[in-house]
A protein has these predicted regions:
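Short N-terminal targeting/anchoring amphipathic segment
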Residues: 5, 73, 84-103, 116-118
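Histidine-centered beta-alpha loop that forms part of the nucleotide-sugar donor binding/catalytic region
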Residues: 9, 61, 99-101, 121-124
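A conserved mid-protein helix/loop that constitutes part of the nucleotide-sugar donor-binding site
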Residues: 17-25
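An aromatic- and histidine-rich active-site surface loop
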Residues: 43, 77-81, 95-113, 128
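A conserved, positively charged/aromatic
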Residues: 69, 87, 118-144
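A short, active-site helix/loop in glycosyltransferases that binds the activated sugar's phosphate group
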Residues: 143-160
Length: 160
């Protein structure tokens, strides 16, 4: 059975977790074994806990009114998911599925371990600030494949 390890920063009811929810339901119905690593927040991804082939791993992540706290929490999650990823170091044929630009820690770990790293790119990083542009650059360096939600996004990437 093929194994997919999926990383999504914030479980909520916004667009990217809704798309991810549909994709993972479809893959689990086809018999893929999926480990989903996401936040403990209540969100659409909670529906996947009833899927036969989906196992969920959760961490604490919250936004704050203080931008410094938010970035520190974000950095903590990147270190945590980077370290968490190494539980798959000896597993063959594992795909690391990175939903959005934000989970860069597990993408880096996957690349270091020689895993296939697939990004699902939802954001328009080039319309946002330096932080997102940096994440988009890192995505292009780390990804084996990039799934874009639009041709507009694809055309803004150097790695096609």
């Amino acid at each position: 059975m093929k194994k997919i390890v999926c990383f999504h920063l914030l479980n909520d009811y916004s667009g990217s977790p809704k798309v991810l929810n549909l994709i993972l339901k479809g893959l689990s119905m086809k018999g893929y074994e999926i480990d989903l690593v996401t936040s403990r927040n209540t969100g659409i991804l909670d529906e996947l806990s009833s899927c036969k082939y989906v196992k969920m791993y959760r961490y604490r992540y919250l936004f704050s009114n203080n931008p410094l706290f938010t970035i520190l929490r974000y950095l903590y999650v990147q270190v945590y998911t980077f370290a968490f990823s190494f539980r798959y170091i000896f597993r063959k044929n594992i795909i690391f599925y990175i939903n959005t630009l934000l989970p860069v820690g597990p993408a880096l770990a996957g690349r270091l371990m020689g895993k296939r790293v697939v990004y699902h790119y939802h954001e328009n990083a080039f319309a946002k600030g330096l932080f997102y542009k940096t994440l988009a650059y890192m995505m292009q360096c780390l990804a084996s494949n990039i799934i874009c939600v639009s041709n507009f996004q694809r055309n803004n990437l150097k790695k096609k």
